[in-house]
Design a protein with these regions (language model features):
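RNase H-like, metal-dependent nuclease domains and their acidic two-metal-ion catalytic environment used
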Residues: 1-87, 114-196
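Conserved beta-strand -> loop -> alpha-helix junction used to position metal-binding or nucleic-acid-contacting
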Residues: 77-110
Length: 196
């Protein structure tokens, strides 16, 4: 899950489910609430631990947000329940076309992201997320996004580095059948050092 903390304004949390076999991401839940800070961050961590057994958070750490992972009550709760708190810093890399927020665009285009739309609550959450996606600007000119919230978009993007790592780890452990392009050799029949 990703957490975009806020001391004032809106704090956002976003939870993805990742299916390794289909390589698809599923939006499980999100929360976007006014106010925030440490009490709200701890509250969402507790709620989602109970509800989803969530044990990995990627938390933005620009400025004040660094205090979230350093807070004693959050550290104690995370330590007691085996929750990994991973920090991330965004700065200008959120606008990077390869690793930034807009790098998620092909996932939507290739239908590798599934957003739930069954039921009123799911529709409200998805509509809010989609509206923030529409107004998120990949341009570094911030004047385009003045007045537009992007908390949910950012919270949904924070776990992407972790998800990409999981994808690479899965590929690295896959058993691939290898057929050499040359014939006549068996792996066990070569008995010479041809490189000498």
């Amino acid at each position: 899950a990703g957490l975009d903390p806020a001391s004032t304004g809106y704090q956002a949390a976003f939870l993805w489910g990742y299916d390794q076999t289909s390589n698809k991401l599923y939006m499980i839940d999100m929360e976007n609430s006014l106010g925030g800070g440490i009490p709200q961050a701890l509250s969402i961590m507790k709620n989602w631990f109970v509800k989803y057994n969530l044990a990995h958070w990627v938390i933005e750490e620009n400025g004040f947000q660094r205090a979230i992972r350093q807070d004693q009550s959050i550290r104690e709760f995370a330590g007691k329940h085996g929750i990994f708190l991973e920090g991330t810093q965004t700065y200008s890399n959120k606008h990077d076309p390869i690793f930034g927020v807009t790098a998620m665009r092909p996932l939507f285009a290739d239908k590798l992201i599934s957003l739930p739309y069954l039921g009123f609550e799911a529709q409200e959450k998805v509509n809010l997320y989609k509206s923030q996606l529409v107004y998120f600007s990949s341009a570094q000119n911030k004047s385009r996004t003045v007045g537009q919230k992007s908390d949910l978009v950012m919270a949904s993007w924070f776990p992407m580095k972790t998800i990409r790592r999981l994808q690479k780890e899965r590929l690295a452990t896959m058993g691939l059948e290898y057929e050499p392009s040359f014939g006549g050799y068996e792996g066990s029949s070569i008995d010479i050092d041809s490189w000498r």
